[in-house]
């Protein structure tokens, strides 16, 4: 057990018996009241966001974690099969662990899997940006290229991304895996 003041963003704690990752932690001292920490956390088992107010003197149980790089191989039902880059061991990761960023998983991409002290998978950290090929989008006309705005495009992983009008089928684009937004066109 450690004081809440020693915990920071990204720490994984055991809260009400389940693992939660701290997404933001703000120290507040309102007027003549006692200081507290306002925490926004994500339940790693259910994926739900939780907001809680800890008193400044409160202690929390920090989970000791290990982070290891794994390579994505393929999807097997509702699980994703990943391979340890060093030992070539394969593990199955449930789809709920990845959340919405799983729609940008493509063969060979490297992710970081966070394991708890008991060996269970707590979280999967995707790369912030991923480069994908546009496989389907509406054709552009000369007039479309002159205007700003977006159009829907299907990328190689099957996800739909809003892209600028000048993007065509076969273009390589960079996408933010956290939000699913188009970042830029990649020139190769």
Swiss-Prot record:
Keywords linked to the UniProt accession: Cytoplasm, Elongation factor, Protein biosynthesis
Name of the protein in its database record: Elongation factor P
Cell compartment(s), UniProt: Cytoplasm
Transmembrane segments: none
Pfam families given in the database record: EFP, EFP_N, Elong-fact-P_C
Organism: Chlorobium phaeobacteroides (strain DSM 266 / SMG 266 / 2430)
Main location per the UniProt record: cytoplasm
Family of this protein: Belongs to the elongation factor P family.
Cellular component GO terms held in the UniProt record: cytoplasm
């Amino acid at each position: 057990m450690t004081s809440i003041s020693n915990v920071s963003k990204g720490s994984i704690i055991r809260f009400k018996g389940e693992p939660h990752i701290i997404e933001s932690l703000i120290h507040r001292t309102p007027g003549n009241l006692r200081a507290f920490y306002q925490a926004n956390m994500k339940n790693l088992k259910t994926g739900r966001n939780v907001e809680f107010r800890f008193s400044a003197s409160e202690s929390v149980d920090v989970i000791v974690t290990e982070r290891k790089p794994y390579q994505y191989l393929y999807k097997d039902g509702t699980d994703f099969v990943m391979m340890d880059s060093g030992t070539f061991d394969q593990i199955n990761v449930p789809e709920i662990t990845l959340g919405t960023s799983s729609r940008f998983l493509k063969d060979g991409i490297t992710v970081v899997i966070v394991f708890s002290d008991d060996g269970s998978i707590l979280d999967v950290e995707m790369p912030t940006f991923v480069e994908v090929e546009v496989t389907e989008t509406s054709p552009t006309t000369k007039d479309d290229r002159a205007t700003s705005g977006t159009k829907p495009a299907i990328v190689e992983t099957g996800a739909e991304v809003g892209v600028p009008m000048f993007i065509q089928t076969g273009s390589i684009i960079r996408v933010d895996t956290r939000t699913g937004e188009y970042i830029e066109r990649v020139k190769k």
